[in-house]
Amino acid sequence: MLREIRDLGFEYAELSHGIRLGLLPGILEAVDAGEIKISSLHNFCPLPLGVNHASPNLYEFSDERARQRELAIKYTLRTFELARRVKALAVVLHLGSMEMKDYTEKLTRMLERDGRKSPKYEKLRAEAAASREARKAKAVERVYETLRIILPEAERRGLKLGIENRQALEEIPLEGDFEFFFREFDSPNVVYWHDIGHGQIKEHLGFLHPIQHLESLAGRLAGFHIHDVVFPAGDHAAPGTGTVDFAALKSFVKPGHIKVFELSPSLPVGAVQCGVAHVKTTWGNE
């Protein structure tokens, strides 16, 4: 897998939340041999024993069950250890979610069928927004408590914690809460990780303006997950094939940022190469 990434011309790769324990020996061999470098890991990596598919939300910092939060901490710390072993700079985190209806799927279906101007759509969108605000407090409190436990461990290891924006409406932090979050956690080891596809989906749904969002968080921005979105929510598409305006994002992209192409494994090599070329042509050498 890593050799295939290298053969596509990449010097660095991110180890994802789909890495099984059995894959580690080969990964470490490739890294130790200098065949590829690791920029970042996505929690949880490696997967817990017995879990064989990508499971970034297997355990959540927001879970009301203490045992589940303990497991989230345990496997996050294990991710930290692997990150140090492969000399990665950052670990990307999902912080958790609140219990509520699946508005994301309902709104997506309605958006595809009726569009944003539908009165029914706007009514459901407003209901979802109000429900989130009413339900978030306890989940956010648990997230903060858990982060206060793991942050010193990240600082001790010299790791950045990349707090990723999410596409599901129930996930934390909410779009308007990121600035409050970063005031609460002002450590330089806590940074913002912008998933371009997730931001685009939230724009389609009417919950986010990605450019304004990035403007407000530019000082904490450290990395990107790069992919496009086929309207309304077909993410992990090759850049240049969907609705993302990569040119509008260019001013936020800096040489020191970690940039990870997060593309569907079903894409043919040619589509990947075209997508990478689209971003490089648009962003230049940043």
Regions found by a protein language model. Name each.
Residues E11-R20:
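A short beta-strand-loop structural module common to alpha/beta enzyme folds
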Residues M1-R6, L21, G26, D32-G34, ...:
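Histidine-acidic metal/acid-base catalytic patches
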Residues L15, L41, L93:
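Short beta-strand and adjacent tight-turn residues that come in two discontinuous sequence segments
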Residues H42-L49, G96-M98:
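Short glycine-enriched loops at secondary-structure junctions
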Residues E11-Y12, K37, L89, K160, ...:
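Residue-level detector of anion-binding/catalytic polar loops
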